[in-house]
Amino acid sequence: MIDVKSIILIVLDGLGDRPGEILGYRTPLQAAYHPNMNRMASLGMTGLMHPISPGIRSGSDTSHMSLLGYDPRVYYQGRGPFEALGLHMDMKPGDLAFRANFATNRDGKIIDRRAGRINAGNDQLASAISIDIGNYKFRVKSGVEHRAALVVSGPNLSDKISDSDPHSEGKPPEPIRPLDPSADSTAKIMNEYLKRIREILRDHPVNVEREKNGQIPGNELLIRSAGKVPDIPSFQEKNGITGACVVGSPWLKGLCRLLGMAVIDVPGAAGTINSNYTGKIKTAIDASKRYDFVLVNIKATDVAGHDGDYELKRRVIEDIDIAMEPLLGQSDRIVVAITGDHSTPCSVKDHSGDPVPIVFYTDGIYSDDVKLFDEVSAMKGALRITTQDVLNILMEMAGRAEKFGS
């Protein structure tokens, strides 16, 4: 008789890193004091996980889809719809959605892609640039800090267009270009929209006041990752188990909603450095009594990596580890996996193609000789897998896997 367990998958966003001189040529994970994750590594099964496949610089969206059992090469159609659905924006068939950032444009060049992580007046800015142009309706909703989503409704919209985001500072916003002849009219209307809203944002009272106070304005909307809602089976239909998520990032809430998973909110659990780690873990443990599978995402490690702050990333890992302690008493009924969705090295300040460490922890599995949870120790572990393998392994360890063959 196989014991059936619940599953908790904890994704520490952008966890993987590279050695830094400031940390004595160690990674933040190596330098951090994290006895609870080390305990799980010493009792569990560890190794390295490649996001998507070796050498791929995956996005958080594609890697999370893969971790949830969906091949992004088949199902991914852009992150825009996830952002919009995560902010409770309605999307009809044919609508086009984008990820968006409020940014700072000075003399035609982007000097800050996040407008100083603007976090006040965002709703007013979003409302001001929600306008109609002819037969096209543009709706913007603000998210966490500088982030927002844009949904466009109108005839014959195509997602085969480029981004306006130059993806680095010191460059002008890119004109929207069609990537297919059928997208010519979409590119044209998007360029017209971006032109009009620059004037609105430039003179908006929120930005005028920010400049008076010595703050940089959110006077540009950078858009990227255009997409329409994909035709995709629910998490339960595809995997045969019920699912829930405990996440702070709106786009990830949107993905989970799209997949029919329950979205459980936790007070103070935002997709930022200042998040309620303890609340997330305790909520996930409680949710595992009602759902077969619970996804937890903690964004803070990725934020520190993008900021290039080794010490902050080390401290964040230590704070997260404290919140992990209650999991150590649940191994008889829960299978826990801890990993990253990708690496965000502080030296790169962006995603890289490096593998990330992973640990599986529960009663009744064999353990390897690894005693520490970090990138280098994981090289000696039992596993060399990709994100696409993770759910299969979790299902098997939880006694939920279907037999392949007779």
Swiss-Prot record:
NCBIfam families: apgM (TIGR00306), PRK04024.1 (NF003104)
EC number(s) on file: 5.4.2.12
Region span, Disordered: 156-183
UniProt cross-references to InterPro entries, sorted A to Z: Alkaline_phosphatase_core_sf, ApgAM_prokaryotes, Metalloenzyme, Pglycerate_mutase_ApgM
Regions of compositional bias (Basic and acidic residues) in chain numbering: 160-174
UniProt keyword annotations, A-Z: Glycolysis, Isomerase
Pathway: Carbohydrate degradation; glycolysis; pyruvate from D-glyceraldehyde 3-phosphate: step 3/5
Catalytic reactions on record: (2R)-2-phosphoglycerate = (2R)-3-phosphoglycerate
Name of the molecule in the record: 2,3-bisphosphoglycerate-independent phosphoglycerate mutase
GO BP term, pick one: glycolytic process
Organism: Thermoplasma volcanium (strain ATCC 51530 / DSM 4299 / JCM 9571 / NBRC 15438 / GSS1)
S-S bridge residues: none
Gene3D superfamilies named among the record's database cross-references: Alkaline Phosphatase, subunit A (3.40.720.10)
Family the entry assigns: Belongs to the BPG-independent phosphoglycerate mutase family. A-PGAM subfamily.
Gene giving rise to this polypeptide: apgM
SUPFAM superfamilies assigned: Alkaline phosphatase-like
Function: Catalyzes the interconversion of 2-phosphoglycerate and 3-phosphoglycerate.
GO molecular function, one term: metal ion binding
